Amino acid sequence: MKKYEVYHNAFGDQDVHIANVNIADDVPVMEALEVVFRKTNNIEGSWSKGPTFEVKGETFDNSDYSENVEVVKPLLVKDGVEWGHRSTSVGDYVIVDGTKYNCASVGWEAAA
């Protein structure tokens, strides 16, 4: 497995190492980056929470959970509510094998 380090810095945020996504070594990098994007987006749950999560006392299955995602930055708890991380967006980046790839409007671009 190859480790893809995900950093959020879009929207003027400070660079934050938010997660690592582990993907099989034989997956081409550009294809793997698309997997990283999907696995760090909130579509039907919260990618940064476990296999289930609770909202107002009700437990839900988390379709966005993946055992291949390691959340690096702890989740925010405010007023007793645990908030998941935001989705990966344009301006965020991933580092793999020492190369930085910026999340672009469409796809990924290797940093110069």
Where are these regions (language model features)?
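N-terminal non-globular leader segments, chiefly Sec-dependent signal peptides
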Residues: M1-K73
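Short alpha-helix capping/helix-loop boundary micro-motifs
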Residues: V72-G84
